[in-house]
């Protein structure tokens, strides 16, 4: 079956997922990493990005004048935040934007019920990840935009497998950056450095969160968006903010269990979910519907 991953959400979202299921697939909204999170979250991964950049620069023997790590250091040390504002704006305008759906390795977790499961009135959708493609280190750059990827979030660090892949991608782009300068000279060198730095952050930032969130044990389903592709980006309003998203489909066969939160009337909710599965010609015998074991009443 593979490892299990859990998505805490509301009853409203569950109804929408099941009602709109097509071709035995559930359609999730993958939100832009930059519109759903604190836009300065990428700074938490400063050391990781710096380490990758400096190792690539050492391997490629990059001169001090062309080093992108120098720009990253200047932005990090800028007390006025002017550099950070320029970088944030460039990230929003970047051609390659990461969109994510959040999961957790924790099943039936009280903190996650409170944070993401409508304070105990929602559901926890338990999926097997075996049909979700992981990162493929071979030929990753062309493939990264053609499929979805699942990986562990790091809290102050990242896993070695992701680190190795990100290292390869950054080195590939760094070579293109140096080749462009070799062919065209150092005109617009700042813009070229900023573009490569943005790419490094776009690759690394989705898997980095502040250590205070380590209790979530998050895994993220990631999809990159290219502006020139045929992917459609849409928008919704949440908490007085406008969030951009793109659609990601997960096979219904991945859904193994629906845990009903500790607060609702379990029998009533369970019967309704079973009826809905039948109405959508989905086999409820393949999906367990169970009650949360968390002793919590809001």
Predicted regions and their residues:
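Partner-binding and oligomerization surfaces adjacent to conserved cores of proteins
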Residues: 1-298
């Amino acid at each position: 079956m593979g490892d299990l991953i859990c998505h805490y959400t509301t009853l409203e979202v569950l109804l929408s997922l099941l009602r709109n299921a097509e071709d035995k697939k559930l359609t999730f909204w993958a939100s832009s990493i930059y519109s759903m999170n604190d836009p300065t979250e990428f700074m938490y991964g400063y050391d990781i990005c710096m380490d990758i950049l400096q190792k690539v620069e050492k391997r490629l023997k990059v001169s001090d004048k062309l080093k992108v790590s120098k720009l990253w250091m200047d932005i990090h040390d800028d007390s006025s935040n002017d550099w950070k504002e320029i970088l944030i704006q460039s990230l929003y305008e970047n051609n390659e934007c990461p969109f994510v759906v959040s999961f957790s390795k924790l099943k039936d977790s009280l903190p996650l019920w409170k944070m993401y499961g409508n304070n105990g009135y929602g559901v926890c959708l338990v999926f097997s990840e075996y049909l979700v493609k992981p990162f493929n280190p071979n030929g990753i750059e062309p493939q990264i935009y053609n499929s979805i990827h699942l990986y562990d979030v790091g809290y102050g660090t990242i896993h070695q497998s992701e680190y190795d892949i990100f290292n390869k991608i950054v080195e590939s782009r760094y070579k293109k950056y140096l080749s462009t300068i070799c062919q065209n000279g150092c005109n617009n060198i700042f813009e070229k450095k900023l573009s490569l730095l943005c790419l490094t952050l776009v690759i690394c930032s989705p898997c980095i969160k502040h250590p205070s969130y380590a209790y979530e044990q998050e895994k993220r389903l990631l999809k990159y968006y290219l502006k020139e592709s045929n992917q459609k980006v849409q928008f919704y309003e949440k908490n007085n903010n406008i969030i951009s998203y793109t659609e990601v489909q997960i096979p219904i066969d991945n859904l193994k269990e629906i845990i009903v939160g500790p607060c609702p009337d379990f029998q009533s909710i369970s019967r309704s979910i079973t009826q809905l599965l039948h109405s959508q010609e989905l086999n409820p015998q393949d999906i367990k519907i169970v009650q949360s074991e968390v002793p919590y009443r809001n």
